Amino acid sequence: MKIYELAKEVNPYVVEMRRYFHEHPELSNQEDKTIERIGQELAGMGIEYEVVPHGGIVAILEGKTPGKGKTVLLRADCDALPVQETKENLAGPRVCCSKVDGVMHACGHDG
């Protein structure tokens, strides 16, 4: 399967996850539910993981030749900011908004 076809196949899942995390933000060092959900998703995919205290999670995905291939590190922030989200942005109504009063994912790369 080509990468574009794979991306189309997983797109609904990716959108669902992005919206879930955007609607349920947690402040730094308080990301317990976020880490729990990520752990559930990883476990559902058969991926082993370890929770790191204060809002972290580490998972190792082995390739076809464990220990012999290249290593890739993927890092992502999962904390939110103490900011009230508005229901609209400059383009109009938001597709999804934080359901937590006074907390939102407000980094420049968040949509």
Predicted features along the sequence, with ranges:
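Acidic/His- and Gly-rich active-site-bordering loop/insert found
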Residues: K2-H105, G111
